[in-house]
Amino acid sequence: MKIIIILFVTLVSLSAYSEYTVDQETINFDSNGVSIAYTVAGEENATPVLMVMGLMASHRLWGEYLVNGLVDAGYKVILFDNRDTGDSENLDRLGKPRIYWKFALSYMGIGFSAPYTLEDMAADGIRVLDELDIDNAHIVGASMGGMIAQTIASSYPERTKSLVSIMSTSGARHLPEMSRQNQDNFSGVGELDSEQVHAYGFYPEAMGRQLTAILQAGDRSEQIKTITVPTLIQHGIDDTLLPVEHGKHTAELIQGSEIIIYDGMGHNLPDEVVPNVLSDMLSFFDR
């Protein structure tokens, strides 16, 4: 099915992140009835950075260079798995949404419910901070994680030192869809094997639930306009899943925000671009 293939490509597009296994233990706690897993790297009293990964992607996909770079720069990096992903709780008990029907309702502008929402996932991130007795943190999110990070910044400004939204979107309906070339490439994508499933912390039945959360949120432009914290938008000029116009529109909505567009970056963080992404992020934090 095309929808499954699209979601698989979205996941695999993050595979340029090298696997990162932090030495510290992974801790699970209860977030309003859902077990959420997190781990921490860096000094206890360092300035915290909460990192939110994208659709169906484990926190391990942030990569060694970016996480170690933040730690080496003196930051405390908090990595967690979104609900239904990685070491956090699998929520198959919530059922499998009829995703084509959700797409149809979304296209027609008709509201619908979701097994859980972007707000729920944002609340999970805030509860991670609560578990660590952290008042506020820099919030960094990629792709769907960027949507969650935007939601944290708008709904919990007092917990947000700053927002970094990477290769993400406002969800506005007028923005361009993925390129035809990218759609044509989907036909060559195979199925995940069991080794890949475990490596990515990927629960196949969860794809529809997370996508439904994105569709249910719809156009978040009005919510994003309320963001008042310092904001950096980072986007790749070669992104064919969320074309660069998505990042530009998000920047236009947030007063005083900054956008940096990277050559050679698609809907991923390739090794040759990560040093610039990290450097720009650190400069932004230091202001």
Q: Where are each of the predicted segments found?
A:
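Conserved HGGG/HGGXW glycine-rich cap/lid loop of the alpha/beta-hydrolase fold
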Residues: 34-103
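Conserved acidic catalytic loop of the alpha/beta-hydrolase fold
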Residues: 109-115, 119-137
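Flexible "cap/lid" loop of the alpha/beta hydrolase fold
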Residues: 147-154, 163-190
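Active-site nucleophile elbow and catalytic-triad environment of alpha/beta-hydrolase enzymes
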Residues: 206-223
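Short beta-strand/loop motif that positions the catalytic acidic residue
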Residues: 227, 233-235
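Short alpha-helix in the alpha/beta-hydrolase fold that links the catalytic acid
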Residues: 229, 243-250
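Acidic catalytic loop of the alpha/beta-hydrolase fold
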Residues: 238-242
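Catalytic active-site module of serine/aspartate enzymes centered on a nucleophile-bearing elbow/loop
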Residues: 257, 261-287
